[in-house]
Amino acid sequence: MLGHIVSLMKNIVVAGSHGKTTTTSLISSIFSFSKIDPTVINGGVLNSYGNSAKLGKSNWCILESDESDGSFLDIPVTYSIVTNIDAEHLDYHKSLDKLKRSFVKFLNKTPSFGKSFICIDDPAIKSISNKIK
């Protein structure tokens, strides 16, 4: 259901082990300040909205995604962001290498008219950067 809703809009999908909620909040604040009213789906409550989700009036969606169970691979992406990658959720991914491969798949879903943004300072992201198209 979420994937279908998001597919109807231009979207920014934020992934990573840490900083997803903060990054999603910052981007949504920038859009709102710029008078672009995005739909926002966040993992934490946004102080400016008093909620973790908000239906906007523009054709933009800013979404915090969840890599813990691989479901972030099911969400359509226009612009992808990965903040960092740590050895988390290995109960699902089984190893750090498999987790990193999931992030490569996520980033490589970004269409040619979109853009991917990564934190190259993060050692795990740096180690996969040559696999990102």
How would you label these PLM feature ranges?
Residues 1-133:
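Phosphate-binding loop of NTP-binding sites
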